[in-house]
Amino acid sequence: MLKFIQNNREATALLAIVCLFVFPGALDSQYLSVQTLTMVFSSAQILMLLAIGATMVMLTRNIDVSVGSTTGMCAVLLGVMLNAGYSLPVACLATLILGIVAGFFNGVLVAWLKIPAIVATLGTLGLYRGIMLLWTGGKWIEGLPAGLKQLSAPVFLGISAIGWFTLVLALLMAWLLAKTAFGRNFYATGDNLQGARQLGVRTEMVRIMAFSLNGGMAALAGIVFTSQIGFIPNQTGTGLEMKAIAACVLGGISLLGGSGTVIGAILGAYFLTQIDSVLVLLRIPAWWNDFIAGLVLLGVLVFDGRLRCALQRNLRRQKYARFISPPTPLQAEAKTHAQQNKNKEVA
């Protein structure tokens, strides 16, 4: 059972989503609808993109806590360029490039300058957030072109063009990680850094690529965020980094690197967003969202740690079982007599 759960974290995440869908449905039958599924998916697109990027970084046994600030900074660039008269494709391309450059800078700090990832990205979290606020003077960006919001308008089956793009991108990244040498390098780097180097994997470049892709996903998340609400607050992206990491852990991405899938991270992001919708249904105040999300994350971390320890004990037991011969019938009988004599003495 333990091995099944460990090897099928995506299935357990999907089961959790189904349970969280059925439970509120018992309270309100209107919740059980395709419209609810598409509504939650629409709300989850930002977190899904960030979870895809976080997966790449976490697979290499690193972590990036600057993606929220990167998302905000990229959203500001998009808004500034659109208000300056640039076309939407040009503004989106520039936004994507900025995100990749920001991620590349994080990767250089970690892979080449050997700064621990948590320390480096904590620094860039403040740096990118500061650039964003200096850029806007602390003001909101409003008056964006109406064409931007069309990206989030439903086009097929209640899902927007940018929603379909997110699904296709998730499937593409899942295929790259599972079926190509490019993807296997991420797993190898996170699972055994020295071993990967001996096999010829350019581990520094793999880690820089992971952070760069993460920055690109943060830029896409900034575009989605802006298209959904039509303006850019000065706190855009705040707190998203923790939710992205939580989504990955919920979906089975190991904090120790080398294991997990993009599909699991996507399901984790959907589950976290689904919690928010259930809280709305239950009329629980919005300020409980972060508390409950944190509680769920802690619960999953504890469960993951206990599961890992149990599996390790089971593996050790199987490994050394062949060195421990079972007792002969004579030894078993002697042990039974000794136990009976001991019980008589005690009596």
Curated annotation (Swiss-Prot):
The gene is lsrC. Belongs to the binding-protein-dependent transport system permease family. AraH/RbsC subfamily. The complex is composed of two ATP-binding proteins (LsrA), two transmembrane proteins (LsrC and LsrD) and a solute-binding protein (LsrB). The chain crosses the membrane at residues 14-34, 39-59, 72-92, 93-113, 115-135, 155-175, 213-233, 249-269, 284-304. One of its GO terms (cellular component) is plasma membrane. It comes from Salmonella choleraesuis (strain SC-B67). InterPro entries: ABC_transp_permease. It is found in: Cell inner membrane. This is Autoinducer 2 import system permease protein LsrC. It is a multi-pass membrane protein. Part of the ABC transporter complex LsrABCD involved in autoinducer 2 (AI-2) import. Probably responsible for the translocation of the substrate across the membrane. Its main location: membrane. PANTHER family: ABC TRANSPORTER PERMEASE PROTEIN YPHD-RELATED-RELATED (PTHR32196), AUTOINDUCER 2 IMPORT SYSTEM PERMEASE PROTEIN LSRC (PTHR32196:SF29).
